[in-house]
Amino acid sequence: MSLKTKYRDIIVPKLMKEFGYTNIHQVPKVVKVTINRGLGEGAQNAKALESSLAEIAKIAGQKPVVTRAKKAIAGFKIRAGMPVGLMVTLRGDRRDAFLERLINLSLPRIRDFRGISPRSFDGRGNYTLGLREQLIFPEITYDSIDQIRGMDITIVTSANSDEEGRALLRELGMPFREN
């Protein structure tokens, strides 16, 4: 069952009952998924930028945007306009396909995985997940990487509170850790 049909047929009625919504448009939904990676030392290294671009494009199925420094910071040896990170925003079918792969394939591949922290909500129902390595994604092979790099994944929902957002993600299959 795809994420879209599961949401429409199972999750919407369940959340309407749980939170007492009167209209299906009140039920929270996933608006977008943003994948972000800071380059760190790769800001000076063009090869690291290229490999990061290729990795994020493989993982997301969409070419990332290079984020650039707005100001020069001498302490970090960064000049204005230098690449400092990569970002990709997924919506629609790409978002659903990525979430399905993340929940069912990638998260279980994390070493010593006991669930993700239920505390990483921002107060408005959005969830941010930090990953330490890119190898958990099946698209990335060990031989194709030059260095282990992490990334941040933000799941933006239309929920009004963390409680609603947590209920939505739990129903979608996110494996939250029991504290």
UniProtKB/Swiss-Prot annotation:
Keywords: Ribonucleoprotein, Ribosomal protein, RNA-binding, rRNA-binding, tRNA-binding
Family: Belongs to the universal ribosomal protein uL5 family.
SUPFAM superfamilies documented for this protein: RL5-like
BP GO terms, sorted: translation
GO terms of molecular function: rRNA binding; structural constituent of ribosome; tRNA binding
UniProt xrefs under HAMAP family: Ribosomal_uL5_B
PANTHER family in alphabetical order: 60S RIBOSOMAL PROTEIN L11-RELATED
InterPro entries hit by this protein: Ribosomal_uL5, Ribosomal_uL5_bac-type, Ribosomal_uL5_C, Ribosomal_uL5_CS, Ribosomal_uL5_dom_sf, Ribosomal_uL5_N
Self-association state and partner proteins as the record states: Part of the 50S ribosomal subunit; part of the 5S rRNA/L5/L18/L25 subcomplex. Contacts the 5S rRNA and the P site tRNA. Forms a bridge to the 30S subunit in the 70S ribosome.
Name of protein: Large ribosomal subunit protein uL5
General function of this protein: This is one of the proteins that bind and probably mediate the attachment of the 5S RNA into the large ribosomal subunit, where it forms part of the central protuberance. In the 70S ribosome it contacts protein S13 of the 30S subunit (bridge B1b), connecting the 2 subunits; this bridge is implicated in subunit movement. Contacts the P site tRNA; the 5S rRNA and some of its associated proteins might help stabilize positioning of ribosome-bound tRNAs.
Cellular component GO terms held in the UniProt record: ribonucleoprotein complex; ribosome
